Amino acid sequence: MRQNKLIEKITASQLRDDIPEFRAGDTVRVHARIVEGSRERIQMFEGVVIKRHGAGISATYTVRKISNGVGVERTFPVHSPRVDKIDVLRYGRVRRAKLYYLRERTGKATRIAERRRDN
């Protein structure tokens, strides 16, 4: 058995199937499990997905929000057990895969048009 096939078999059991479809430009709310000492709580992080990267078990996405006038970005693994759930709030219409240009924009310049979705 080739090494790639072995890795695929091992990681296939760890892939999550409850992840909704989302891409760059979409507004999401990520429910992340945070461990503080012996306590565990769920922290919500809501913002715009500025990029998705990779495939399979190593796939990640970065969410950006503005908190108290400061831009905050967090990168989450797509298939992480630390992410409780992902809610897609808005589907954005963008023409780029990576929205790094949002880092230089503030206020109304960061708005993204909504994408039509056929059910």
UniProtKB/Swiss-Prot annotation:
Xref: InterPro entries: Ribosomal_bL19, Ribosomal_bL19_CS, Ribosomal_bL19_sf, Translation_prot_SH3-like_sf
Family annotation (Pfam families): Ribosomal_L19 (PF01245)
Annotated keywords: Ribonucleoprotein, Ribosomal protein
Molecular function GO labels: structural constituent of ribosome
Domain of life: Bacteria
Record GO biological process: translation
GO cellular component: cytosolic large ribosomal subunit
HAMAP family in the cross-refs: Ribosomal_bL19
Function summary: This protein is located at the 30S-50S ribosomal subunit interface and may play a role in the structure and function of the aminoacyl-tRNA binding site.
Family named by the database record: Belongs to the bacterial ribosomal protein bL19 family.
NCBIfam families reported in the protein's UniProt record: rplS_bact
Protein name: Large ribosomal subunit protein bL19
Organism: Limosilactobacillus reuteri (strain DSM 20016)
